[in-house]
Swiss-Prot record:
Protein family (similarity comment): Belongs to the ATPase protein 8 family.
Locations listed in the record: Mitochondrion membrane
UniProt gene name: MT-ATP8
Annotated keywords: Acetylation, ATP synthesis, CF(0), Hydrogen ion transport, Ion transport, Membrane, Mitochondrion, Transmembrane, Transmembrane helix, Transport
Name of the protein in its database record: ATP synthase F(0) complex subunit 8
Gene Ontology molecular functions: proton transmembrane transporter activity
GO cellular component: mitochondrial membrane; proton-transporting ATP synthase complex
UniProt organism field: Ornithorhynchus anatinus (Duckbill platypus)
Chain positions with N6-acetyllysine modification: 55, 58
PTM-bearing positions, type N6-succinyllysine: 55
Segments passing through the bilayer: 8-24
General function of this protein: Subunit 8, of the mitochondrial membrane ATP synthase complex (F(1)F(0) ATP synthase or Complex V) that produces ATP from ADP in the presence of a proton gradient across the membrane which is generated by electron transport complexes of the respiratory chain. ATP synthase complex consist of a soluble F(1) head domain - the catalytic core - and a membrane F(1) domain - the membrane proton channel. These two domains are linked by a central stalk rotating inside the F(1) region and a stationary peripheral stalk.
Lipid bilayer topology: Single-pass membrane protein
Entry superkingdom: Eukaryota
Length: 69
């Protein structure tokens, strides 16, 4: 049974990877990316401080009646 000639496999695989890379690059060039929207009014994006944001509050639960018996 004759042996399989693998001497050209390295070249074939290398050229295939190069071709896939080139095709991918050509597809990416044609792709249209969205532009980043310009922020026209910065005041719309400022978080408004409310009184409870600056204070630490904790809600206490009433004692359970079951635990007292």
């Amino acid at each position: 049974m004759p042996q399989l000639d693998t001497s050209t496999w390295y070249t074939t695989i290398l050229l295939m990877i190069l071709a896939i890379f080139c095709i991918f690059q050509l597809k990416m060039i044609k792709h249209l990316y969205m532009n980043v929207p310009l922020i026209l009014n910065q005041e719309l994006f400022i978080k408004h401080q409310t009184p409870w944001h600056s204070k630490w509050t904790k809600i206490y639960l009433p004692p359970s009646l079951l635990l007292q018996s």
